[in-house]
Amino acid sequence: MEVKDTNCTSLGYGKPPWIFKGSALYQLHLVKAENARAFIPKECKLVEAFGYTLGGFFLASYDDSPAGIFDELVVIAGLVWNPPTSCAWAARVLVGSDEACLHGRKVVGLPSQVARFSKKITALPQKPESKSSSFLRRIGLRTSSNYKNHMDVEVTEIKKQTAMSICNINVNATASQQDSKGWMGPLIKMSLPNFSGRTKYNSDLLKYSCQIECRVRAVQPAKVSGPSESDADKENSSEDQSSNVESVSRVPRGTKRNFSISVMLSKPILALEFNHLKMRVEAPTTVTACSHDTT
């Protein structure tokens, strides 16, 4: 099914694989299948059950990458069949770097947009913890409740000369996050396969993988709130003015941002904190079509 590598040495990123280091929050949501399908090509089969698929978001802060230091929010629409497993499909990728945005669009086929990440940390008193909860937390079977700070991350998309609020993510920061000696979970290695492409910047259907090595543990899901109505109206007006640009995407004009926000606001089921993250992104390959054979 894979036929060729894409041109990966352009745009200043150098040759693959590309290495990203930092920390991240990986939060899984139950996403309505009808919303996820708005982003996924017709030839790809959505993994769904009872009208829902598994999506969510990946909020990362990189302190070392081919594009330097920057923040990233990947909104995951859902899972697409790739027998015998499945691949994630990104609905929107917001990055705090022009270089990362251009590379994502042109090389990896991602729906990337430049964004501003504004962070505000507020100190909170720590809550008492029982002996049993403390033991379970240390072995990774219970989320920590010793919150020392919480952090609000306001994500604002920068489109031409317009700034539009996407969402606010309230992340609970635990005491051990502030203390490098704190227990941050077991060291794991895993592979996250992804489909991408079918955009106005890259019309090919692509597949790439992220090889992740990090300390991981379960945490309390972040609380997400959407933008104000004025920002929503601003986005729709901006989309209308740029309607002469044809997109390969199936998402109706003026709704891409709204569908992405609906994914962010959907029901969270699991949140994983990645510390000492090292992510190795392989070169994307062009595929002929998504396989529908799930047997």
UniProtKB/Swiss-Prot annotation:
Entry superkingdom: Eukaryota
Region (Disordered): 221-251
Gene Ontology biological process: xanthophyll biosynthetic process
UniProt xrefs under Gene3D superfamilies: Acetoacetate decarboxylase-like (2.40.400.10)
TM regions (residue ranges): none
Phenotype of the disrupted gene, per the record: Pale yellow flowers. Absence of neoxanthin and reduction by half of xanthophyll levels in petals.
Function: Required for neoxanthin biosynthesis. Probably not involved directly in the enzymatic conversion of violaxanthin to neoxanthin. Is necessary but not sufficient for neoxanthin synthesis. Seems not required for abscisic acid (ABA) biosynthesis in response to drought stress.
Protein name, entry field: Protein NEOXANTHIN-DEFICIENT 1
The species this protein was found in: Solanum lycopersicum (Tomato)
Record gene name: NXD1
